[in-house]
Swiss-Prot record:
InterPro entries: AB_hydrolase_fold, Pept_S9_AS, Peptidase_S9_cat, Peptidase_S9B_N, Serine_Prot_S9B/DPPIV. One of its GO terms (molecular function) is protease binding. Residues 1-4 are cytoplasmic. Homodimer; homodimerization is required for activity of both plasma membrane and soluble forms. The monomer is inactive. Heterodimer with DPP4. Interacts with PLAUR; the interaction occurs at the cell surface of invadopodia membranes. Interacts with ITGB1. Interacts with ITGA3. Associates with integrin alpha-3/beta-1; the association occurs in a collagen-dependent manner at the cell surface of invadopodia membranes. It holds the Pfam family Peptidase_S9. PANTHER family: PROLYL ENDOPEPTIDASE FAP (PTHR11731:SF136), PROTEASE FAMILY S9B,C DIPEPTIDYL-PEPTIDASE IV-RELATED (PTHR11731). SUPFAM superfamilies: alpha/beta-Hydrolases, DPP6 N-terminal domain-like. Glycans are attached at residues 49, 92, 99, 227, 314, 679. This is Prolyl endopeptidase FAP. Gelatinase activity is inhibited by serine-protease inhibitors, such as phenylmethylsulfonyl fluoride (PMSF), 4-(2-aminoethyl)-benzenesulfonyl fluoride hydrochloride (AEBSF), 4-amidino phenylsulfonyl fluoride (APSF) and diisopropyl fluorophosphate (DFP), N-ethylmaleimide (NEM) and phenylmethylsulfonyl fluoride (PMSF). Dipeptidyl peptidase activity is inhibited by 2,2'-azino-bis(3-ethylbenzthiazoline-6-sulfonic acid), diisopropylfluorophosphate (DFP).
Length: 760
């Protein structure tokens, strides 16, 4: 349930008064023309057509100084930063000949796969057809062509070996024209998954479409096997156009249910026919009860690191294993196990962080909580207890991008104390005396406060991608001097288009409530006048480890509501949200549905005190976890909200996936946390919806938060004789895409305008 990362149409939070400290107006004035006579407000059509969407530029690095990029006319172009050389490596004609939408160059640069017939499955997974193009001869390889559709395909890190997954089994090709070698034979739809995750691991643990990993030089291939044979199945109808609907069946472990059985195997990719796959042992302290595999990291061709979690996800074990040539097995001694345990919540953030190994192939860097409860980078050589803390402070390290022999590159929200910012830092390591440098803090400071980065081999060069708060911009930099080499994308066309638009104003501030800090973003109408009264819409996600109040650029549905309809929008990061320390993050542990809701209500009361909110016109809306929070807020009995919208909400945690739910709630058993599972349902509050206008929305083919959730809410409301509105989208999943998107936002707009008594 990571909808907060994907909602395209959200972003907003609140504004203007004492009690609140530290304000920054996010949207730069350069994209706002104050001459109202020549500008217009945003329209809903602008949003639905993506008129003001921005571009980013991520180089597809193929060496320390070379990268590929797909041009606007669909040519794949090669660039050498140091020589200035540039040429088309794959023409749009070649791409079009097989209707390719994606490509992948082999490391030896002799071949490229072209991907077509994309067919989406779940959040990350899809199937596709793959054609192999011989770049030397300028033709497609016809001998021993790949089967179709393929579930996953990848090149080895060196040369041009291919590994792919077809019908849940793994195959290997030494060369693209060679016949395939079948590695696994037990793959079976919805039963045994080899090299690809099942639904719950894809969505809630790995966050990828693959579960196979090449060793650094392609000597070995590691893969996961997921056995879903005993997992309960969720079944729902897909109506299509046929006389009878078909039934979709997905092995889906809900809270407390039987989980998949996972095993990790490694096979010699050079001589796979001589020695079969070898299983990697699970640490004894993990294997003694239900457990999860959380990630795999190759260190060298003969050393691998695996991470495991207990089912109650407060204990993680990192196990380093070495290949024994004499026995042709993988040895994982207990002395090479490192335990990470949380006594106040779950292990890690949303996921347990992965290690980044240093050049000695023994020690590594990893992000986990320090003694003060903030997530920071630590250096581990022998034991976690003896870890050396690399970063510290009342802020958090977010991601380690790259470790070289003399530098460590990472992102954090340290600069100026704003949790919703991201800057890129370099720390010197190795023989140099440690020193820290912020690479991005003072680059285009007004425009850019939220960065990510993409590094070439050995961090020789890197691209910075700024997401806001001003217009996004992508730039190329020298990895040794940090000097900007060139602008890759500056969104100049978007800048010119926005000169004629009355954009809303955005502010980020914070509320102090008792000993809690609530950061919020408020989106204000262009001609905002604090002496007037405005309707207020709260946009909420609120799930554990999420963050809504970020310094990023977006022209979205809520931008339109502020610009055209004169609605004030607010987003609030309350307890349970991320990157502000464990005290705030773990406050919701085993108590979902309590503090997230309380903090939204508290913020609304503070906004009313500011004097410009019409307290008779306040609404709340959210999607997924946000739909759950908005539903509970509406049913809180406070009388604050006139109306609200819940899109694809969870209604009971017993209905949601085991890995996600149990991470934050424990098990739904009498001797664990069943009582709160029962007390935290939306249905238990059905009577309290009587005095609000409630719009309930769901897709009937939602594989993530099943339609069952909204069906149970509707049943409870009917049984309580509570009037409400509902909209379902046939055959639509959790994202409600395509034509459903336009219908959804049009429908929600009408609902809000009616609630707020706004004219059409």
């Amino acid at each position: 349930m990571k909808t907060w990362l994907k909602i395209v149409f959200g972003v907003a939070t609140s504004a203007v008064l004492a009690l609140l400290v530290m304000c920054i107006v996010l949207r730069p004035s350069r994209v706002h023309n104050s001459e109202e006579s020549t500008t217009r407000a945003l329209t809903l059509k602008d949003i639905l057509n993506g008129t003001f969407s921005y571009k980013t530029f991520f180089p597809n690095w193929i060496s320390g100084q070379e990268y590929l990029h797909q041009s606007t006319d669909n040519n794949v172009v090669f660039y050498n930063i140091e020589t200035g050389e540039s040429y088309t490596i794959l023409s749009n004609t070649t791409m079009k000949s097989v209707n390719a939408s994606n490509y992948g160059l082999s490391p030896d640069r002799q071949f490229a796969y072209l991907e077509s017939d994309y067919s989406k499955l779940w959040r990350y997974s899809y199937t596709a057809t793959y054609h192999i193009y011989d770049l030397t001869n300028g033709e497609f390889i016809r001998r021993n062509e790949l089967p179709r559709p393929i579930q996953y395909l990848c090149w080895s890190p060196v040369g041009s070996k291919l590994a792919y997954v077809y019908q849940n089994n793994i195959y290997l090709k030494q060369r693209p024209e060679d016949p395939p070698f079948q590695i696994t034979y037990n793959g079976k739809e919805n039963k045994i998954f080899n090299g690809i995750p099942d639904w719950v691991y894809e969505e809630e643990m790995l966050a990828t479409k693959y579960a196979l990993w090449w060793s650094p030089n392609g000597k070995f291939l590691a893969y996961a096997e997921f056995n879903d044979t005993e997992i309960p199945v969720i079944a729902y109808s897909y109506y299509g156009d046929e006389q009878y609907p078909r039934t979709i069946n997905i092995p889906y472990p809900k809270a407390g249910a039987k989980n998949p059985v996972v095993r990790i195997f490694i096979i010699d990719a050079t001589y796979p026919e001589h020695i079969g796959p070898r299983e990697v042992p699970v640490p004894a302290m993990i294997a003694s009860s239900d457990y999860y595999f959380s990630w795999l990291t190759w260190v060298t061709d003969d050393r691998i690191c695996l991470q495991w979690l207990k089912r109650i996800q407060n204990v993680s074990v990192l196990s380093t294993c070495d290949f024994r040539e004499d026995w042709q097995t993988w040895n994982c001694p207990k002395t090479q196990e490192h335990i990470e345990e949380s006594r106040t919540g779950w292990a890690g953030g949303f996921f347990v962080s992965t290690p980044v190994f240093s050049h000695d192939t023994i020690s590594y860097y990893k992000i986990f909580s320090d003694k003060d409860g903030y997530k920071h980078i630590h250096y581990i050589r022998d034991t976690v207890e003896n870890a050396i803390q690399i970063t510290s402070g009342k802020w958090e390290a977010i991601n380690i991008f790259r470790v070289t022999q003399d530098s460590l590159f990472y992102s954090s929200n340290e600069f100026e104390g704003y949790p919703g910012r991201r800057n890129i830092y370099r720390i010197s390591i190795g023989s140099h005396s440690p020193s820290k440098k912020c690479i991005t803090c003072h680059l285009r400071k007004k425009r850019c406060q939220y960065y990510t980065a993409s590094f070439s081999d050995y961090a020789k060069y890197y691209a910075l991608v700024c997401y806001g708060p001003g217009l996004p911009i992508s730039t190329l930099h020298d990895g040794r001097t940090d000097q900007e080499i060139k602008i890759l994308e500056d969104n100049k066309e978007l800048e010119n288009a926005l000169k004629n638009i009355q954009l809303p104003k955005e502010e980020i501030k914070k509320l102090k409530v008792d000993d809690i800090t609530l950061w919020y973003k408020m989106i204000l109408p262009p001609q905002f006048d604090k002496s007037k009264k405005y309707p207020l819409l709260i946009q909420v996600y609120g799930g554990p480890c999420s963050q809504s109040v970020r310094s990023i650029f977006a022209v979205s549905w809520i931008s339109y509501l502020a610009s055209k309809e004169g609605i004030v929008i607010a987003l609030v990061d309350g307890r349970g949200t991320a990157f502000q320390g464990d005290k705030l993050l773990y406050a919701v542990y085993r108590k979902l549905g309590v503090y997230e809701v309380e903090d939204q209500i508290t913020a609304v009361r503070k906004f009313i005190e500011m004097g410009f909110i019409d307290e008779k016109r306040i609404a709340i809306w959210g999607w997924s976890y946000g739909g759950y929070v908005s539903s509970l807020a509406l049913a809180s009995g406070t009388g604050l909200f006139k109306c609200g919208i819940a899109v694809a909400p969870v209604s009971s945690w017993e209905y949601y996936a085991s890995i996600y739910t149990e991470r934050f709630m424990g098990l739904p058993t009498k001797d664990d946390n069943l009582k709160h599972y029962k007390n935290s349902t939306v249905m238990a509050r059905a009577e309290y919806f009587r005095n609000v206008d409630y719009l309930l929305i769901h897709g009937t083919a939602d594989d993530n938060v099943h339609f069952q959730n909204s069906a149970q809410i509707a049943k409870a409301l009917v049984n309580a004789q509570v009037d409400f509105q509902a909209m379902w989208y046939s055959d639509q999943n959790h994202g409600l895409s395509g034509l459903s998107t336009k219908h959804l936002y049009t429908h929600m707009t009408h609902f809000l305008k009616q609630c707020f008594s706004l004219s059409d």
